[in-house]
Amino acid sequence: MDFVVGLPRTPSGNDAIWVIVDRLTKSAHFLAIKLSFSVEQLAELYVAQIVRYHGIPKSIISDRDGRFTSKFWRSVHQAMGTKLAFSTAFHPQTDGQSERTIQTLEDMLRACIMDFKGTWDKKLPLIEFSYNNSFHASIGMAPYEALYGRRCRSPVHWYETREKELVSTDFIRRTTEAVKLIRRRMETTSSRHKSYVDKR
């Protein structure tokens, strides 16, 4: 668990992203938030967006943000039976996974920011979808496939296979175009990272 901060404020008032990554499947949730959210608001969002879909985790690793070290946050997780651990600087098991995910998310946002014209929070679900349906070398598959045991049906494929039925559906067309754009940006960013690593 970690936050991406310093983002431009959207018309909805969101200015940060709460990143939550499953250690086993590498699946991630990107939740648009206001940096001013209280720990109580974060706890409500956590139950609504994480616990309801995945149940209560055995353990959580987060950075040492004051909200995660607060008495309230600790008591909520103690009541749920979740062990809290805090990342230690330069310890790859605790801080590496979220940091890599956040770096990928930041790269995706930077690549798409001009295309989304200040409404990054509206496209965040599609960015999350694209991230979770992209191949991860560390697990040998996409996080979605690791989580659900099958590949995900994608709007990109809906458009390609049933084009005649869906052409009139503007929402599907816009969603498909956004997912394709995000995937292209991800590929470009990934190529740049690979090129940089290869030069080392």
Predicted feature locations:
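Integrase module of LTR retroelements
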Residues: 1-200
